[in-house]
Amino acid sequence: MKRGHDYSSSDSELDENIEVEKESADENGNLSSMSPSTSSQILARKRRRGIIEKRRRDRINNSLSELRRLVPSAFEKQGSAKLEKAEILQMTVDHLKMLHTAGGKGYFDAHALAMDYRSLGFRECLAEVARYLSIIEGMETADPLRVRLVSHLNNYASQREAASTAHTSIGHIPWGGTFAHHPHLSHPLLLAQTAHTNSTSSSTEAHHHNRLRGSPHAESSSLRVAPNGNIASVLPVVASSKLSPPLLSSMASLSAFPFSFGSFHLLSPNSLSPTTPTPSGKPYRPWGTEIGAF
C-alpha cells in the first residue's frame, strides 16, 4: 500500500532533516574516504551549529531572567521557589493583560512602577522581621510584642499602598512621610535639636562647641566638634566598658565621614550607660517599650 504524503512538516524542516541525514551518512560511511579539507569543513560546520545553538539558549535564558525581574508577581515569588519557564511566561501574559485592562496605566508611570517595587521590598523586609523575631529572639507567634510590631508594619504597608494609588490626585508622598511626624516614635537615646539657619550658623556652632567643652563628660562620652562646626573624622575617646559593642561599631562608622552638625540628632551624654541584662536572662531590647505606642 502506498503511504500518503505527510504535509505536517514545513519545507525548511524537511530540508534541514535531509541535510542532517546527508551529513550523518557522510560522517559514518565515507569519513575515511574524505579528503582532509572536506572533513575539516564538516567539523567546522558542526562546531558553528553548536555555538549558534548555545547563543540561542543564552538569549532565551537572559530574556526569561529579565521577565522574572520585571514582572512583579514573578519577582515576588523568585525568592521562595524556582520558577519554571512556562510559569514566567504565564505571569508575563497575565501582567500584560492586567495592564491592557487598566487602560495602559503603568507603561510610562515611573513613580507607580517604583512604588510597586518598594511595596514588594517592604513586604519582604516585614517577612524577615517576623522570621528574626521567631528564630533569633525566640518569640512565639502569639507574643504580644511580636503581634503589635507585625500588625503595625502591616498597617503601614497598607497605608503606603493606598497612598500610592491616589498619587495622581494628591501628588508624591515621600516614603518616610508617615514616620516623620509620628508623636510616639521619639527614642530616649535621641535628643531634639532645633534647626539651624544660615543667618545664625556661627553663633549656634559656638554654642554647641562651648556646651560640649563645658560638659564633664565631653572628652569621654560625646563627639568632638571641629572649628568649622562639623563633626570631624575623629573617633571619640570612650571607655569600652561604658559602651556596648554595637554602639561602639556605629560610633566608629560615624567617625569615618564628616557630617554637618545640624543635620542629625546627637546622643545624650548620660544615655551612654551600660546596658543591664534583665533578671529573666533575655537580651535587653530598648525598642520593646516603644512598640506599645504603635
From Swiss-Prot:
InterPro entries, A to Z: bHLH_dom, HES_HEY, HLH_DNA-bd_sf, Orange_dom
Keyword match Secreted: no
Induction details: By Notch signaling.
Cited SUPFAM superfamilies: HLH, helix-loop-helix DNA-binding domain (SSF47459), Orange domain-like (SSF158457)
Pfam families: Hairy_orange, HLH
Gene Ontology CC: nucleus
UniProt keyword annotation of Transcription regulation present: yes
Ranges spanned by the short sequence motif YRPW motif, renumbered to the chain: 284-287
Domain bHLH: 44-99
GO MF: bHLH transcription factor binding; DNA binding; protein heterodimerization activity; protein homodimerization activity; RNA polymerase II cis-regulatory region sequence-specific DNA binding; sequence-specific DNA binding
Residue intervals of the Orange domain: 117-153
Annotated GO biological process: circulatory system development; floor plate development; glomus development; negative regulation of DNA-templated transcription; negative regulation of transcription by RNA polymerase II; Notch signaling pathway; pronephros development; proximal/distal pattern formation involved in pronephric nephron development
Family statement drawn from the similarity comment of this UniProt entry: Belongs to the HEY family.
UniProt comment concerning the protein's domains: The Orange domain, downstream sequence and the bHLH are required for efficient heterodimerization with hes/hairy proteins, and for transcriptional repressor activity. The C-terminal YRPW motif is not required for transcriptional repressor activity and is unable to recruit groucho.
Name recorded for this polypeptide: Hairy/enhancer-of-split related with YRPW motif protein 1
Origin species: Xenopus laevis
This protein's encoding gene: hey1
